[in-house]
Amino acid sequence: MIENRPWLTIFSHTMLILGIAVILFPLYVAFVAATLDKQAVYAAPMTLIPGTHLLENIHNIWVNGVGTNSAPFWRMLLNSFVMAFSITLGKITVSMLSAFAIVWFRFPLRNLFFWMIFITLMLPVEVRIFPTVEVIANLKMLDSYAGLTLPLMASATATFLFRQFFMILPDELVEAARIDGASPMRFFCDIVFPLSKTNLAALFVITFIYGWNQYLWPLLIITDVDLGTTVAGIKGMIATGEGTTEWNSVMAAMLLTLIPPVVIVLVMQRAFVRGLVDSEK
């Protein structure tokens, strides 16, 4: 029997409310700043009451971009979406097929190949990123969607997760498929893929957010303003030296940048949670 402790309930709810407040208050301040004009946003202290310039600020960056030499913000949003979706689709496809081959095909040194993939997790990003940039430059893929997305499609983490899931699938499924005369790809498409849908949903959300939040890679690969992404664009709005940052425009751009990943999480919330729970069973 669980003992009822009112003080513990009050304490846990208080901590929950404080945690939510700590998370939401900066977002509220950003929203308020996005609704103010240039003068009001620099007032000390800045008001916490929303203003009336939100649509004006959004229209300004939507049409004129985030700086004197930048593409319109809608273009940056489109580039970020193409980048995130391409990375997600490619990462899931490559990782799933790699794990399928490692688990279900009996070929020499297959475990060695897996550990060669897995050991890349031990290398810091800083160690891998500059050789990757050199390869992309030699392949003439700078300033292109291919250079922006292809190097980020390989994932040791996703391959490991799919491998662990495939290993718990019963061998009877393979035997039944062989008796029915199914080819490996038929077995993959008709049996393995449907059983992996919850894991796919969880990985889709995580990978999309990972691709959407990329900052350093686009900064190294892209010099064409028409291929710029939102995260790098927002960083470019923050002035250095004696320049003045238009924080109302920065916060408006940040709010627009939040919308796509939030929509993805809300739409796939059930499948995302179910995928995380099922993967631990």
Swiss-Prot record:
Entries under Gene3D superfamilies matching the protein: MetI-like (1.10.3720.10)
Membrane topology label: Multi-pass membrane protein
Signal peptide as annotated in the record: none
Localization terms from the record: Cell inner membrane
Parts of the chain that traverse the membrane: 16-36, 85-105, 113-133, 142-162, 202-222, 247-267
Domain ABC transmembrane type-1: 77-268
Coiled-coil portions: none
Predominant place of localization: membrane
UniProt cross-references to Pfam families, sorted A to Z: BPD_transp_1
Matching InterPro entries: MetI-like, MetI-like_sf
Any one GO BP annotation for this protein: transmembrane transport
Sorted UniProt keywords: Cell inner membrane, Cell membrane, Membrane, Transmembrane, Transmembrane helix, Transport
GO cellular component: plasma membrane
Family (UniProt): Belongs to the binding-protein-dependent transport system permease family. UgpAE subfamily.
Quaternary assembly: The complex is composed of two ATP-binding proteins (UgpC), two transmembrane proteins (UgpA and UgpE) and a solute-binding protein (UgpB).
Protein role: Part of the ABC transporter complex UgpBAEC involved in sn-glycerol-3-phosphate (G3P) import. Probably responsible for the translocation of the substrate across the membrane.
Official protein name in the record: sn-glycerol-3-phosphate transport system permease protein UgpE
Species assigned in the record: Shigella dysenteriae serotype 1 (strain Sd197)
